Amino acid sequence: MAKRDYYEVLGVSKTASDDEIKKAYRKLAMKYHPDRNPDNAEAEEKFKEASEAYEILSDSEKRSMYDRMGHNAFEGGFGGAGGGFGGFSAEDIFSQFGDIFGGAFGGGGRQQRQRRGSDLRYVMELTLEEAVKGVKKTITFTAPAPCDVCDGKGSKNPKDVETCKTCHGSGQVRMQQGFFSVQQTCGTCRGQGKIIKNPCHACHGSGVADRQQTLEVTIPAGVDNGDRVRLSGKGEAIRDGQAGDLYVEVVVREHEIFQRDGADLYMDVPVSIADAALGKEIEIPTLEGRVSLKIPEGTQTGKLFRLRGKGVRPVRSSMVGDLLCRIVVETPVNLTSRQRELLKELQASFDGEDSASSPKKKSFFDRLFD
């Protein structure tokens, strides 16, 4: 009987992520595990089929080979790879020689790697002030954690946990591929080396259960959009393995006044026509409080003033950026009768003489009509 497509076996698409593949396999394994289906040959066959599919699709190199050549990649030795070792790294090749020749090539004595849970991601939204100055925040999220009932063991009674008879507790089995002996994860115990005879009723033997968790997170001063804070061991928990990490990713809300570019801050400073023309000392806000800014006589829209050291000190940097103030000269609106009169008088005074009061305007028209 022809083998079914591995993606079809797990019920996932060919573009499925590693997490999606893991979740699909876990669901099938719990459903068809021999311990939960004694004397059920069909369930045992489905369990083996799912384990075989997961063994290939959970390994990036094997998955790549399978995507290119299908089941032929793992049948009849290394057929389909042009007679060589297509798709296998040098480490894989020498590890297989080591299996045969007693570790002469450094691969025979490798020990099983400790299983590890998946890393998790939490998006935290901050104000600009919080990102620049640092903050402590409490977060709440739901993630797999050690089961409270069985203390993460998968069974309340330690006597109900036995050494796997297929792999004898190693979590690995040897598969013959032509001339070579290849070590693979044991499909019976899923690489754990143990079989649970009487699974915990709360977690069904997995040793973990989804639980709401609350953590206090310290965000360092100077973080920016996309920066991540790593909380070691706070990710997905798994039975008989190491928990993954939790990554808190920073998203900074848009500020009504300041825009950030690396270590520097930018802001628009509105100035009246009179203040821009005559000059004035004004007060402007910064993240540290209000400071004075001197507007020289004749300041134009777009003029930048730099206030050194009023920006941001990025994470892992000893340098503080600057605050750059862009002047925006505002045209007055909703004029009173008196203001309109005065502006008309001013307008007439400008139009009535060849004044140097508008040098850019004069230069523009000179070029236009030359």
UniProtKB/Swiss-Prot annotation:
On cofactor binding, the record's note says:
Binds 2 Zn(2+) ions per monomer.
* Keywords assigned: Chaperone, Cytoplasm, DNA replication, Metal-binding, Repeat, Stress response, Zinc, Zinc-finger
Coiled coil segments of this chain: none
Coarse class of the primary localization is cytoplasm
**Which residues does the record give as Zn(2+) 1 binding sites?**
147, 150, 200, 203
- UniProt subcellular location: Cytoplasm
Binding-site residues, Zn(2+) 2: 164, 167, 186, 189
Q: Which Pfam families does the record associate with it?
A: DnaJ, DnaJ_C, DnaJ_CXXCXGXG
Q: Name one GO biological process term.
A: DNA replication
CXXCXGXG motif repeat extents: 147-154, 164-171, 186-193, 200-207
Q: Name one GO molecular function term.
A: ATP binding
Q: Where is this region: Disordered?
A: 351-370
Task: Please provide, in alphabetical order, the Gene Ontology terms of the cellular component aspect for this entry.
Answer: cytoplasm
The text the record gives for the protein's domains is: The J domain is necessary and sufficient to stimulate DnaK ATPase activity. Zinc center 1 plays an important role in the autonomous, DnaK-independent chaperone activity of DnaJ. Zinc center 2 is essential for interaction with DnaK and for DnaJ activity.
Subunit comment: Homodimer.
Q: What is this protein called?
A: Chaperone protein DnaJ
What's the name of its gene?
dnaJ
